[in-house]
Amino acid sequence: MHAIAPRLLLLFVLSGLPGTRGGSGVPGPINPPNNDVVFPGGSPVAQYCYAYPRLDDPGPLGSADAGRQDLPRRVVRHEPLGRSFLTGGLVLLAPPVRGFGAPNATYAAHVTYYRLTRACRQPILLRQYGGCRGGEPPSPKTCGSYTYTYQGGGPPTRYALVNASLLVPIWDRAAETFEYQIELGGELHVGLLWVEVGGEGPGPTAPPQAARAEGGPCVPPVPAGRPWRSVPPVWYSAPNPGFRGLRFRERCLPPQTPAAPSDLPRVAFAPQSLLVGITGRTFIRMARPTEDGVLPPHWAPGALDDGPYAPFPPRPRFRRALRTDPEGVDPDVRAPRTGRRLMALTEDASSDSPTSAPEKTPLPVSATAMAPSVDPSAEPTAPATTTPPDEMATQAATVAVTPEETAVASPPATASVESSPPPAAAATPGAGHTNTSSASAAKTPPTTPAPTTPPPTSTHATPRPTTPGPQTTPPGPATPGPVGASAAPTADSPLTALPPATAPGPSAANVSVAATTATPGTRGTARTPPTDPKTHPHGPADAPPGSPAPPPPEHRGGPEEFEGAGDGEPPEDDDSATGLAFRTPNPNKPPPARPGPIRPTLPPGILGPLAPNTPRPPAQAPAKDMPSGPTPQHIPLFWFLTASPALDILFIISTTIHTAAFVCLVALAAQLWRGRAGRRRYAHPSVRYVCLPPERD
């Protein structure tokens, strides 16, 4: 007895030292409680205003129940509670719940919080308590056990559960609304909590009960050093193996539908005190304090987007800017990149295509073969065929045809391999579209010398081979002309006009098609034929009498299918981007079938980080949108093997080896024992003494 008393006295003295709580050596509250910043029924905010790791509470014991065992007997609906503050910081939202079970009994609690927006009701936090003392709110210290904390965002989430309350960081004037569902025994408490920062009072969307709260939120001080380096991130935010939704997408639930643990994508295994610290750390990182460590007293609307304390700078919408207006983008943003689309498809507003857009100013093109305009009232002509040389495989000629019964061949067009801005009067009247180009004037020089060697062609700009149609005379070769030269034949031109020829049956309307060449890293243009069935080359005007009209070209995707270059995607399969001149089919033959698409032949990995955006067939769903089913739980061979299937195989192999060794040892011991027994038997042979008769002399 005399030896125990000094030890008890020493333990009592150590437990009462300043700066410790309960003799555990863990620092206490960083500042005394502030009763001015307290919601009714809640705890002081200052107790949970820290940004360093603390382990004051006991840890959770396990996972939450997947399904609800029994429905609550009574539902209690509370009035909405709203608060408005002048400054930003951490705010503790406590629901106005009174009466926590009978005084001398235990109860179980199920706490769930939802974040409400105009289009979603997202569960953000879920926790279950068990064995709670009656008359006291559920908490890790007043309950016998509690489960892991399931989170709806992150990692890490910016909210934290404090017993049955919600710790929220606020910094903007945009109000946030939360819904709580707290089940205490057989009662289910439901209500709304609303909070905002800034302004002269509650916003116009605040409930009538909202009022200005005295005091203000608490801003946690910046901890010295790096105390979170020793804390594994898996403790406070890990993937939930039982999540049944799509990854990286918020889970929205219908109104009044209770959330289950499988509705939240992440789970935290840390105790409550550590989760409160990570919430304060997240707030400090998002608020971006000044150099002296002082946070600003107030944040303007949208401070987290474009203010001086923005945590994450807004990502520039390069792709969207290039899709909407190529001329309004900074030239540095539109730098050449590998995998850039080489042809831009646009039409004017008169087209039926949903992606048509009028051209603002004519832009220079890489190489365009233009044909002289033909007046519809002039003498009818027949299409002339122009065969470009092999080294100019990426050029094409513009063909102009008048819709008359007879046709006379017109002089072929002269292809130009040099870059020159198209003249204003070069467009064929009545074609229904204008010449468009997505190349910048600053990137394309006005004039360049004629190349003497074949220019390199890109994989995406290689034209599709065409099947020669019916011709009355052999075509004449096309010769490159000087820059800005007219496409009409001259006296010095080697091209001669073809003899007139008549073609029976109706002919196609005026069609003007120009193909361009583009070097890697630049953008070319290609005219698309009019979508009007009266002027389309494959429309009813070309089909023989009595044949069914071909279906109109279908839309092959969203706006990304017809957008300009700059997004790092390969060109789509569109026949209008091949730069081929449409020819009038023979009336005696059916219209030719639509040629197959050209697939890009770039090696894998050349498209860069935007390779996952490569379009796939419609029948195949994108791999990133496919729901990943839960991993099947491992069924161990024995109850004590719970690690992995490899452990089962290793255990079987080890058991087999040990069993074989044991059998060999037993057999060897038996063999040795048998030999030892045999030697004992023959070591002392039985000797018989025989009396010999005496010898006689």
From Swiss-Prot:
Residues 322-335 have a biased composition (Basic and acidic residues). This is Envelope glycoprotein G. Residues 298-389, 402-630 are annotated as: Disordered. Chemokine-binding protein that inhibits neutrophils' chemotaxis. It comes from the Viruses. Residues 670-697 are intravirion. The lineage of its organism: Viruses, Duplodnaviria, Heunggongvirae, Peploviricota, Herviviricetes. Residues 560-576 have a biased composition (Acidic residues). Keywords: Glycoprotein, Membrane, Signal, Transmembrane, Transmembrane helix, Viral envelope protein, Virion. Glycoprotein G is much larger in HSV-2 than in HSV-1. Belongs to the alphaherpesvirinae glycoprotein G family. GO terms for cellular component: membrane; viral envelope; virion membrane. Residues 375-389, 402-445, 481-529 have a biased composition (Low complexity). Residues 446-457, 465-480, 542-552, 587-603 have a biased composition (Pro residues). The chain crosses the membrane at residues 649-669. Glycans are attached at N104, N163, N435, N510. It is a single-pass type I membrane protein. Residues 1-22 form the signal peptide. Residues 23-648 are virion surface. It is found in: Virion membrane.
